């Protein structure tokens, strides 16, 4: 009985994987717009990606996507008679490997190299004597995510890892 269940599960997984092959392939283009999940403020995340290589690294079904990312996030920390205002603008390039596991679910992971145009500003007593902190610069990090397709061109995604937020979710348009 266990062998039969295992065989049925394997057939189901492989049949779903074969149906999932068109989720992301060479030439596929994605535009994603999302928001970050943070305690303060609402980060905005925008990205574009294009499938450039199928069977990446010799792995059947693995597709390399390259693209760009833009993120914006600002918030203020108010405390009595003073406040800090933080702003981050991230502009970068992404490389993601997509692998279809089940029908309608595009799973992926990869890296981003970006520049963080950041600022921190103090407003309050003794503002002239408070040193401005050093912020911003080049950043490198990893991303893992999944995109579920509602239709051939529209889906929802969730990403975790480096970006304007540790977790971002939103809509994805495929064309």
Feature locations, PLM:
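Cleavable N-terminal export/targeting peptides
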Residues: 1-26
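Short glycine/proline- and aromatic-enriched beta-strand/turn motifs that initiate or cap beta-hairpins
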Residues: 19-68, 168-174
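Flexible, solvent-exposed loop segments that connect beta-strands
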Residues: 22-24, 28-30, 57-59, 68-91, ...
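Predominantly the C-terminal beta-signal and adjacent terminal strand-loop region
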Residues: 25, 73-75, 129-175
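Hydrophobic, lipid-facing positions within transmembrane beta-strands of outer-membrane proteins
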Residues: 29-31, 42-46, 64, 89-93, ...
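Residues on the lipid-exposed face of transmembrane beta-strands in outer-membrane beta-barrel proteins
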Residues: 35, 46-50, 93-97, 111-115, ...
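Transmembrane beta-strands of outer-membrane beta-barrel pores
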Residues: 35-41, 50, 70-76, 85-89, ...
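Outer-membrane beta-barrel channels and translocator barrels
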Residues: 53-59, 100-104, 151-153
């Amino acid at each position: 009985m266990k062998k039969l269940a295992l065989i049925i599960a394997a057939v189901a997984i492989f049949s779903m994987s074969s149906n999932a092959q068109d989720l992301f392939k060479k030439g596929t283009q994605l535009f994603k717009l999302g928001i970050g999940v943070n305690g303060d403020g609402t980060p905005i995340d925008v990205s574009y990606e294009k499938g450039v290589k199928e069977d990446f690294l010799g792995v059947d079904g693995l597709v390399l996507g390259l693209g760009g990312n833009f993120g914006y996030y600002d918030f203020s920390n108010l405390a009595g008679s003073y406040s800090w205002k933080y702003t981050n603008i991230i502009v970068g390039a992404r490389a993601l490997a997509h692998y279809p596991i089940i029908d309608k679910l595009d799973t992926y992971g990869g890296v981003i190299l970006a520049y963080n145009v950041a600022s921190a500003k103090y407003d309050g007593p003794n503002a002239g004597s408070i040193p401005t902190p050093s912020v911003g610069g080049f950043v490198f990090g990893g991303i893992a995510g999944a995109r579920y397709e509602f239709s051939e061109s529209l889906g929802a995604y969730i990403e975790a890892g480096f970006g304007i937020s540790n977790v971002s979710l939103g809509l994805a348009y495929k064309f």
